Amino acid sequence: ENINYCAEKGIKVLGTSEHAPSMPGAPHYWYFGNLKVVPRVINGVTILKGCEANILDIEGSLDMSDEASKNLDYMIASFHEPVFKPRSREENTLAILNVMDKYDKVEILGHLGNPNYQLNYEAIIKKAKEKDIMIEINNSSLLGSSRIGSDVNCKKVALLCKEIGTKVILTSDAHINTCIGVFNKGIELLKEIQMPEELVMNDPEKLIAHLKSKGRLSDL
């Protein structure tokens, strides 16, 4: 359904990133292992096989082992309230910093603007640049349909990415096919702050080159 929608709309690359198993209602680990049988290109759409992994503790553990994630092209690391209850600013920040040190497959930090999690954005964004990790600009957060109150923080995050020179990626956080590729609020924000184009990783060739530089996508 998602692939056919992308083909109809002329979307060339689809990143699929289902929630990892600790999230209520998420698929079993075997779902992610089975992604190895999904062709790289279907109906002219290149498939990037990912996962939105849950941060479990301040040590930076994720609910995706090396074995479970070995067939993935990338992981998004995110906080979700049912899995990691918000803690102090220092503890929340430490958890994300530790994730970046522990998991090579983490390519994106998800919805940092969530106001329920106080964070030292500067420390996180500086380390993300050092590790060549992208910061998500989440359209759903900016719309206010999820993580209400994120918009102000999202702007702070985007401005720091611009200042520090950290890569960003616009995401739709689509939970239905008709929302795939909907970045309107994210685009508005990046235009408003005059984000340099070279930091925005949504161009298919640029994104694929980024992943290839990390040793991914050997079949492309």
Language-model features: locations:
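Histidine/acidic-residue-rich catalytic or RNA/ligand-binding cores of hydrolases
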Residues: E1, G25-Y29, Q118-K126, S145-L160, ...
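Active-site metal-binding motif and surrounding structural segment of the metallo-beta-lactamase
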Residues: N4-V13
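Extended substrate/RNA-proximal surfaces in nucleic-acid metabolism proteins
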Residues: A7, A20, P24-I137, K191-V200, ...
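Ser/Thr-glycine-rich phosphate-binding loops at phosphate-binding pockets of nucleotides
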Residues: V13-H19
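Short gly/pro/ser/thr-enriched loop/turn and capping motifs at secondary-structure boundaries
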Residues: P21-S22, V83-F84, L142-G144, I176-T178
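His/Asp/Glu-enriched short active-site or ligand-binding loop at hydrolase and phosphoryl-transfer sites
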Residues: M134-S146
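Short acidic/histidine-rich active-site segments
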Residues: T166-I180
